[in-house]
């Protein structure tokens, strides 16, 4: 599959809320002629699900129909099994995900070119203390958000880079502002080696109000609301 070097995407974490918000934004952009399918995408945690779904043309409705594992859940492979229900054993070279390798806690990028996306999203979303690490090729990985919520600095080069940061902006007061500052710093690092511009999305106040507490990030009904909010934000956003 050929990628589109003029456009790329990087999507951050945020639980079920983050998946809904990111896929809403992605769908809203697609309606406006900015289609990320077939473009290089980098996802962290929830963002890895958004990237995989976009690459494989899996709808948010299909993802929302998955049963959410109970937390904490020490069983190995439980999240990968859920992901395989919608992604099967498909691979896709346009998808890369950020994971944290244990025990060294090293931020690592894995490619979907030769590893099933179901395994990649499970590794990138294995929240320590809630889910068991995901093993890939003999190595153990946990949630990529342990080291960075978005990892813009690790994104591929593109003329325009779509950044979706579900936990930045108005989310959780000071925490959202911290994520935003971290993401801004990563953008500066990315710009040192790439000349592209950014199209940035972070939840507005109304969207952030859907998830006022951390546990709300894993509520399916709130995630559906976030999807429609992301859709509206992308439709209304001024894009040059």
Task: Indicate where each model-derived feature is located.
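Patatin-like phospholipase
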Residues: 1-44, 52-240
């Amino acid at each position: 599959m050929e990628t589109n070097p003029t456009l790329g995407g990087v999507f951050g974490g945020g639980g079920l809320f983050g998946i809904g918000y990111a896929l809403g934004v992605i769908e809203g952009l697609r309606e406006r002629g900015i289609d990320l399918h077939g473009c290089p995408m980098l996802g962290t945690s929830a963002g890895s699900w958004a990237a995989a779904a976009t690459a494989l043309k899996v709808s948010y409705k299909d993802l929302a129909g998955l049963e959410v594992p109970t937390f904490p859940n020490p069983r190995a492979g439980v999240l990968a099994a859920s992901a395989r229900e919608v992604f099967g054993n498909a691979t896709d070279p346009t998808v890369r995900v950020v994971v944290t390798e244990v025990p060294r806690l090293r931020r690592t990028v894995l490619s979907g070119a030769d590893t099933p996306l179901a395994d990649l999203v499970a590794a990138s979303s294995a929240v320590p203390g809630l889910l068991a690490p995901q093993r890939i090729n003999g190595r153990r990985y946990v949630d990529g958000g342990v080291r960075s919520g978005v990892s813009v600095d690790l994104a591929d080069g593109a003329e325009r880079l779509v950044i979706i940061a579900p936990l930045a902006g108005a989310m959780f007061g000071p925490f959202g502002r911290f994520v935003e500052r971290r993401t801004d710093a990563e953008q500066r690092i990315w710009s040192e080696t790439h000349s592209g511009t950014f199209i940035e999305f972070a939840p507005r106040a109304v969207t952030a109000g859907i998830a006022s507490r951390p546990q709300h990030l894993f509520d399916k009904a709130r995630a559906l609301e976030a999807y429609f909010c992301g859709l509206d934000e992308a439709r209304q956003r001024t894009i040059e």
